[in-house]
Design a protein with these regions (language model features):
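C-terminal structural segment of proteins
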Residues: 1-295
């Protein structure tokens, strides 16, 4: 039996392998039903240690170079890039403001040093911090497995809580944000700042040309089975002049709330979540106009 070296997230495993290529990882995942990839381990290792998830084989993907790096030419981000790397990269800060703010709010420094972008997305939590920022930047997910490579829009990556479109032998390889125009912002509410996951979150992007909104994006998290964009809210903003945006933002916020499918749980009630969707959507949209994404 091997114990993974993930600090306080360590857990004993019977079958631990460490491939150096996506092709090798795909083969190792396909060989054993119940195999799971390991990147940062901040979710998987905790679930295993607590007995909440049984994993027949752990496939450590941290040595796969194809999953690393931020490409300053095409703006793509490797699925294995850690939150700390996102926070330190000037291209990400300049182009994807909402993503930087989400990464900054994802746990404390130890979590940020370990948690990866791909892991945060593939855990498929409705509250995944980086999901809504990637949604508002029209991101494409690059997936690779034994059958080759394919691309899906990031809003098609999740099929439900804890579930994705990835086949058992596939890895999320890179994220390719498709839009950098305008400003983006991220807002959330949590129980304990930088410790707990979001109770509700929202991200937005506005591209203003000649005093008029040309492109609008609004996405909500922890308010439905999966993170989602709100096309009705976006449509309420397009074509509106910046001096007339206040009522349009309020209308968009109401539409975002209407699109939510919140649940009651130990952290918050459905009614509270629905109300906060409107509040956070409005804050995120106004954050775009401020040119910053304050938490």
């Amino acid at each position: 039996m091997t114990t993974t070296t993930q600090g306080e997230f360590a857990a004993p495993v019977d079958d631990y392998v460490c491939p150096t290529s996506v092709a090798e990882a795909a083969r190792l995942l396909a060989e054993v039903p119940g195999a799971r990839p390991l990147a940062g381990g901040t979710d998987l290792m905790v679930q295993m240690r607590l007995g909440h998830r049984r994993v027949e084989r752990v496939v450590d993907v941290t040595r796969i170079q194809q999953l690393r790096g931020i490409d300053h030419e095409d703006g793509s981000i490797g699925a294995g890039v850690r939150m700390r790397e996102l926070l330190a990269d000037p291209l990400v800060a300049d182009r994807y403001t909402a993503l930087v703010e989400a990464a900054r709010l994802l746990g404390g420094r130890q979590i940020q040093a370990m948690a990866t972008l791909g892991g945060n997305l593939c855990n498929a939590s409705p509250a995944a911090e980086t999901a809504t920022p990637l949604l508002v930047h029209d991101t494409v997910a690059v997936i690779e497995g034994s059958q080759g490579q394919r691309e899906v829009a990031v809003d098609e990556l999740w099929t439900g809580p804890g579930s994705t479109v990835l086949a058992p032998d596939e890895l999320l390889v890179r994220l390719r944000p498709g839009a950098v125009e305008g400003r983006s912002a991220y807002r959330r509410i949590e129980l304990r700042r930088s410790v707990d996951i979001a109770v509700v979150s929202a991200a937005a992007r506005l591209h203003v040309v000649a005093g008029e909104v040309r492109v609008a994006r609004v996405a909500i998290g922890a308010a439905a089975p999966t993170p989602r964009r709100v096309p009705d809210a976006e449509a309420a903003l397009v074509g509106v002049g910046v001096h007339d945006l206040d009522p349009a933002i309020e209308r968009a916020a109401v539409l975002a709330s209407a699109a939510a499918e919140p649940i009651d749980d130990t952290r918050a009630g459905a009614g509270y979540r629905r109300a906060m969707v409107a509040t956070l959507a409005a804050r995120a949209l106004r954050g775009c106009l401020e040119g910053t994404a304050k938490g």
